[in-house]
Amino acid sequence: MFKWYVVQVFTAQEKKVKKSLEDFKEASGMSDFIQQIILPSENVMEVKKGEHKIVEKYIWPGYLLVKMHLTDESWSYVKKTQGVVEFLGGGAPVALSEEEVKNILADLEEKKSGVVQKHKFEVGSQVKINDGVFVNFVGVVSEVFHDKGRLSVMVSIFGRETRVDDLEFWQVEEVVPGQESE
């Protein structure tokens, strides 16, 4: 019976491992045991220096989903593939439940159908400036221009609120509440 398993692979080698598993399953006679291999990813819109670029980002870096009939032979084949660390569950791989699979596949389908904005800055959120004249200043977002990948931030300079305009998304990072002093 085919079930879904989560396979841990070396980070940054997800595509390579997926391709290896797919390419060699035919040659090694594993196509009867391995049905499908998914690298969970989504399309993300990044804006750098005013240019919009859609890039593929892995939702679970270092993991693949493999739909397979688990036998000693198929387990060994996957485990011995270069770049594979282990099955989740360790020595005894644990299959995902039907409910987990349904939720994961629905989530992946939803994420693949659109493009996610990488930066979700909102007016009123706190950010730290990482580049430019005001580097290391912490301020509050006053305007967001998602179409241009830019925002404006209000910072306090000598006790006076000053607006810093035309910052690109990559020049700032969100500040987690309670960690402003880092």
Curated annotation (Swiss-Prot):
The GO annotation for biological process reads: DNA-templated transcription termination; regulation of DNA-templated transcription elongation; transcription antitermination; transcription elongation-coupled chromatin remodeling
Cross-referenced SMART domains, in alphabetical order? KOW, NGN
What are the entry keywords? Transcription, Transcription antitermination, Transcription regulation, Transcription termination
Spell out the GO cellular component terms annotated for this protein, sorted alphabetically and separated by semicolons. Answer: cytosol
Pfam families, sorted:
NusG (PF02357)
Any coiled-coil regions, as ranges: none
Q: Does the keyword Transcription regulation apply?
A: yes
> Does Transcription count among this protein's keywords?
yes
Q: List the CDD domains.
A: KOW_NusG (cd06091), NGN_Bact_1 (cd09891)
Q: Which PANTHER family match?
A: RHO-INTERACTING TRANSCRIPTION TERMINATION FACTOR NUSG, TRANSCRIPTION TERMINATION_ANTITERMINATION PROTEIN NUSG
Explain the purpose of this protein: Participates in transcription elongation, termination and antitermination.
Similarity comment: family membership: Belongs to the NusG family.
Question: What is this protein identified as?
Answer: Transcription termination/antitermination protein NusG
Per UniProt, what is the name of the gene that codes for the protein in this document? nusG
